[in-house]
């Protein structure tokens, strides 16, 4: 049941203080890492903070609390909270462990419902520390392995190589691909093209104006937007036609699951906010496969290929 007010809570086990006291005696630090996106609501924020304060006061123990309030690199299962909290301190990961109820179970033994998430178990996996559910750690209950959601290693679904790209003699390139698919990184390899992007210019009208200005002076243009539909691509194709330019479409083939993964990866790598899921869902809902009949002269398909140090890339997001 949902709590009624800030005082409507109870300890998971009556002797919780003894558990925590013993851990502190053995040299452990007690840290609460919590995702709380509801902090945007002042009333909910007050209630949650009040409960935490009541709990810490009741325990009479040194307990640290780190709360992620945004959908960014600190939100579990990202490890940003841990990194921000501990900084450069050396932590014994072999002895450390994390207890959480977002374990990916298809049936929680207490609530009889599936867990709302798998973020706690993924958080521990990303840190390389042991994970326990509250039921197992405090009550010594276990649950069948078959009741655990699988944690797909999305990073294993990406190709490891692809052929080099040759723009040939094309002066207009239109990119097609969902958020996070590597379009902007691809653009960086084509320094002789002027980038036309709504991420930079915000409005399509400004993009069209810039494209006109570049082409009429003999420059080259690469349109760096998601461009999922024929309608989204139409205006750019018309401008290219006005100047008699051939158009090369570069479609970056990334699945929705991979796009979700890549958006989270970029968020963690750059320590930024995460692109909302709705942007990804919208792309795939509007997507129309590019065809020459809409005015494209050639269509090339590419993939996202991870490069460099893959340590961060090979994490759960």
Protein language model regions, located:
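Short, acidic loop-to-helix structural element flanking the phosphoryl-transfer center
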Residues: 2-31, 39-53, 75-80
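Glycine-rich phosphate-binding P-loop
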Residues: 173-190
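Pre-Walker A (Motif I) flank of P-loop NTPase domains
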Residues: 168-173, 218-219
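Substrate-recognition/cap helix-loop segment adjacent to the acidic, metal-dependent catalytic center
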Residues: 30, 36-67, 86-90
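Conserved GTP-binding G-domain of TRAFAC-class P-loop NTPases and closely related GTPase folds
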Residues: 72-139, 143-154, 257-317
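Conserved phosphate-donor/acceptor-positioning beta-strand/loop module used by diverse small-molecule
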Residues: 243-263
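Conserved substrate/cofactor phosphate-moiety recognition/catalytic segment
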Residues: 185-234
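A short, structured active-site edge motif that brings together acidic residues
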Residues: 59-75, 250-255
């Amino acid at each position: 049941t949902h709590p009624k007010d800030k005082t409507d809570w109870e300890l998971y086990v009556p002797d919780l203080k003894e558990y925590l006291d013993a851990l502190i005696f053995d040299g452990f630090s007690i840290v609460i890492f919590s995702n709380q996106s509801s902090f945007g609501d002042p009333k909910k924020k007050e209630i949650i903070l009040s409960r935490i304060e009541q709990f810490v006061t009741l325990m009479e123990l040194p307990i640290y609390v780190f709360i992620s309030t945004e959908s960014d690199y600190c939100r579990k299962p990202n490890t940003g909270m841990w990194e921000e909290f501990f900084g450069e301190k050396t932590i014994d990961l072999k002895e450390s462990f994390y207890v959480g109820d977002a374990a990916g179970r298809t049936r929680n033994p207490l609530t009889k419902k599936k867990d709302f998430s798998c973020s706690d178990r993924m958080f521990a996996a990303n840190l390389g520390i042991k994970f326990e559910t509250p039921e197992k750690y405090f009550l010594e209950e276990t649950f069948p392995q078959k009741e655990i959601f699988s944690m797909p290693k999305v990073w294993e679904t990406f190709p490891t190589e692809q052929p080099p790209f040759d723009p040939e003699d094309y002066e207009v390139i239109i990119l097609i691909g969902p958020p996070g698919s590597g379009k902007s990184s691809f653009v960086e390899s084509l320094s002789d093209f002027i980038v036309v992007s709504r991420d930079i210019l915000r409005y399509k009208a400004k993009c069209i104006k810039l494209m006109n200005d570049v082409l009429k002076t003999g420059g080259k243009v690469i349109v760096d937007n998601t461009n999922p539909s024929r309608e989204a691509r139409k205006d750019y194709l018309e401008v290219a036609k006005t100047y008699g330019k051939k158009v090369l479409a570069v479609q970056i083939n990334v699945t929705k699951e991979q796009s979700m993964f890549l958006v989270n990866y970029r968020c963690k790598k750059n320590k930024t906010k995460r692109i909302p899921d709705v942007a990804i869902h919208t792309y795939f809902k509007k997507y129309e496969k590019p065809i020459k009949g809409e005015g494209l002269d050639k269509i090339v398909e590419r993939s996202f290929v991870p490069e460099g140090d893959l340590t961060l890339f090979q994490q759960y997001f």
